[in-house]
């Protein structure tokens, strides 16, 4: 099998991200026939159909999704190679770390775990330019962004039965307990309706919920944890929330411990083996670990 060239990888990514050969051609400054020819060549080299063609465009097959994820990650290594080599050339005895560092994180982690780490990272390595995207921790979540090649490092919830996508490296940064949060001064918070949001916790914590006969089914669903906190503060219900989310709690709510057998969740970083060896990702992991606790 012949190796795919960088331009062939770029074309695969462009077709997947634009949803069609014509749109990919326009984005890359190529003709549609050149894009079609390149994709057919890539399919012949890889021995698999990568895109389903239709009148409305092109969508990756399962094989295509895997190919595009690898393509993104390989192209990213080309970028990092250039940045690290240039930094080594200017380092005068030590490596100068520079370039874009792509980070994916769920909302409360982006608000509370990342800022102190990024502040120290900027002080030590001013040439690094972090790009942070907040993603919902549902389904593949932040770990999926890393696996798909859209992020160099993700801040994700760990420890679920599904685990991180195969082939990724991870490390625990914090273990946070869940608490009962309810309107301040309420005489019987457990009698209130339960408020929840989709990305609150995984199935491993939900099993604890199901074993508690005092927890009703959620009657109110909100978009995110900030909305849940606001609604609880307005007296509309109670909620069970992790500590990171509760850092935004105001005097409008009270927080009650759920005891030593209450649920906990692990929050950590996720990256690929190739990104784990890059200078910028290694530097960020060091800062995240020093933020730990």
Question: Model regions: which residues?
Answer:
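Central regulatory/effector-binding core of bacterial HTH transcription factors
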Residues: 98-161
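Acidic, Gly/Pro-rich loop/turn segments at junctions of secondary structure
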Residues: 135-192, 245, 250
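Alpha-helical linker/hinge and terminal dimerization helices associated
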Residues: 45-46, 67-94
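A ligand-binding cleft/hinge motif common to bilobed small-molecule-binding domains
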Residues: 155-165, 226-255, 261
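Secondary-structure junction motif
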Residues: 157, 192-217, 277-285
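Short helix-boundary/capping micro-motifs
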Residues: 13-31
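A short LG(V/I)-centered, amphipathic sequence patch enriched
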Residues: 21, 43-65
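A late-sequence structural motif
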Residues: 187-188, 236, 254-293
């Amino acid at each position: 099998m012949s190796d795919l060239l960088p331009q062939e990888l770029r074309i695969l990514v462009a077709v997947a991200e634009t949803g069609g050969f014509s749109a990919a051609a326009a984005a890359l400054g190529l003709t549609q026939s050149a894009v079609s020819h390149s994709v057919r060549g890539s399919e012949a080299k890889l021995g698999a159909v990568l895109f389903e063609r239709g009148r409305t465009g092109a969508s990756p097959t399962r094989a295509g999704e895997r190919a595009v994820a690898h393509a993104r990650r390989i192209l990213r290594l080309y970028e990092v190679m250039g940045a690290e080599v240039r930094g080594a050339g200017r380092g005068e005895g030590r490596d100068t770390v520079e370039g874009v560092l792509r980070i994916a994180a769920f909302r409360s982690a982006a608000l509370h775990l990342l800022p102190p780490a990024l502040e120290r990272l900027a002080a030590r390595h001013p040439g690094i330019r972090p790009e942070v995207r907040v993603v919902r921790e549902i389904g593949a979540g932040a770990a999926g962004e890393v696996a798909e090649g859209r992020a160099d490092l993700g801040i994700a919830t760990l420890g679920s039965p599904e685990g991180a996508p195969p082939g990724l490296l991870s490390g625990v940064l914090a273990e946070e307990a869940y608490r009962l949060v309810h309107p301040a001064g309420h005489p019987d918070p457990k009698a209130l309706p339960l408020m929840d949001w989709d990305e609150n916790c995984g199935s491993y914590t939900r099993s604890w919920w199901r074993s508690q006969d005092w927890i009703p089914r959620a009657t109110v669903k909100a978009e995110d944890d900030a909305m849940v906190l606001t609604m609880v503060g307005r007296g509309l219900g109670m909620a069970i929330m992790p500590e990171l989310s509760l850092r935004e709690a105001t005097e409008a709510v009270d927080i009650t411990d759920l005891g030593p057998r209450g649920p906990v969740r692990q929050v950590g970083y996720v990256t690929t083996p190739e990104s784990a060896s890059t200078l910028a990702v290694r530097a960020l992991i060091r800062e995240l670990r020093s933020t730990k606790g």
